[in-house]
A protein has these predicted regions:
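Acidic/polar loop patches that form or flank catalytic/metal-binding clefts of enzymes
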Residues: 18-22, 79-84, 139-143
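Buried hydrophobic packing segments
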Residues: 72-76, 128, 319
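Extended, charge-enriched "interface" segments that sit outside catalytic cores
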Residues: 112, 129-134, 138-211, 215-218, ...
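Glycine-rich phosphate/pyrophosphate-binding beta-alpha loops
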Residues: 55-62, 114-116
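A glycine-rich dinucleotide-binding beta-alpha-beta segment and adjacent secondary-structure elements
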Residues: 2-57, 85-95, 240-293, 298
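Mobile "lid/hinge" segments at catalytic clefts and subdomain interfaces of large enzymes
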Residues: 94, 102, 106-134, 139-143
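Internal hydrophobic alpha-helix adjacent to the cofactor/substrate pocket in enzyme cavities
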Residues: 65-83
Length: 326
């Protein structure tokens, strides 16, 4: 509102009749395109080689705009980057914009993601470093550190899964942690899954009975020695991250496995591509609303079609039959 109007509004409030405005309020307005006219690489569907990123796509600024710039930049430079909804919040952001559009500046919130247990802050490098390396964004030395970290996490989890602790070894620690005592041997991974225990509580007990040697890089969760091919020790911050990752992956294994299964089902739908030039009016059985939405939005695959408002499970079944008949 104009400054004089703002002043009039404030002075109409009891007690503020003589107030002075130090700095008037303002609103930010900007033009934007219809993001549903972009594909998942942020390229215009009807103009090859034209990419859009940022607030012009209907998102808010800052992180949302920067994330789109990263994807559009890689793809416009000739690389290939496509992050799906189960791989990163960037994937959720872009998929929502190009599939559903938006009536107000889009903010990326965790509640928008179906696979939040997979999209954790602690595993961002495990999810995305491989994609970044293939896109040319990750240098070889950093990528090698990542692969070593990944190998050590997997090796440590395998090692701990083979260790069984007897009551006489574990019960003193369990009593100190007010955890139920053992009457027979228990896998160390099962102990880590107890709510009152974690990796650091039980790791000191492991070497006393372990016949499985620690990995070359990683020793007992606290020490590191040179790995294969005379590589230098892993930095301390990576060792700390390894411990955290081992603890999380063991403790929440059941929940993580459930979400991985759900994500696998989601990806099956994503891999069923819909040809760009389908005439939806010719597909018998589709409801009128579905035909109109599909014709306008032109989803790239069956998964994207399933997230369009107005496309029902019955419509998806008809599309699936159509694809199989082609």
């Amino acid at each position: 509102m104009p400054e004089d109007v703002q002043e009039e509004v404030y002075r109409s409030i009891q007690g503020l009749e003589n107030c002075e405005i130090m700095r008037p309020a303002y609103a930010i307005e900007y033009d934007c395109i219809d993001p549903t006219q972009l594909n998942l690489q942020l390229e215009a569907k009807h103009i090859q080689g034209l990419y859009f990123a940022g607030q012009i796509n209907g998102s808010s600024g800052y992180e949302e705009a920067a994330a789109q710039g990263l994807v559009a930049g890689v793809n416009s430079a000739g690389g290939t980057m496509n992050i799906d909804r189960a791989e990163g919040y960037i994937g959720v952001l872009i998929d929502d914009l190009v599939t559903k559009g938006t009536n107000e500046p889009y903010r990326m919130m965790t509640s928008r993601a179906e696979y939040r247990l997979l999209l954790r802050q602690d595993n961002a490098d495990l999810r995305l470093t491989e994609k970044g390396y293939k896109a040319g964004l990750i240098k070889p030395d950093r990528y090698r550190l990542f692969t070593r970290k990944q190998e050590v996490i997997e090796a440590e989890i395998r090692r701990l899964a083979k260790i069984t602790l007897s009551p006489d070894i574990a019960n003193k620690m369990l009593a100190e942690k007010f955890s139920a005592l053992l009457s027979s041997g228990s896998k160390i991974t099962d102990l880590i899954k107890r709510p009152e225990l974690n990796y650091w509580d039980v790791i000191a007990l492991a070497p006393k009975q372990s016949e499985e040697p620690p990995s070359a890089d990683y020793v007992q969760g606290v020490g590191v020695q040179a790995g294969a091919h005379d590589e230098p020790p892993l930095p301390e911050y990576i060792r700390d991250a390894i411990e955290e990752q081992v603890n999380i992956q063991i403790k929440y294994e059941g929940y993580i496995s459930m979400q991985l299964t759900q994500a696998a089902s989601f990806r099956k739908m994503e891999h069923k591509a819909l040809p760009a030039h389908i005439d939806y009016d010719e597909i018998k059985g589709l409801r009128i609303e579905a035909r109109q939405k599909l014709s306008k939005l032109r989803p790239a695959n069956l998964g994207q079609a399933s997230r369009i408002t107005g496309v029902s499970p019955a419509d998806l079944s008809i599309l699936l039959v159509y694809l199989k008949a082609r």
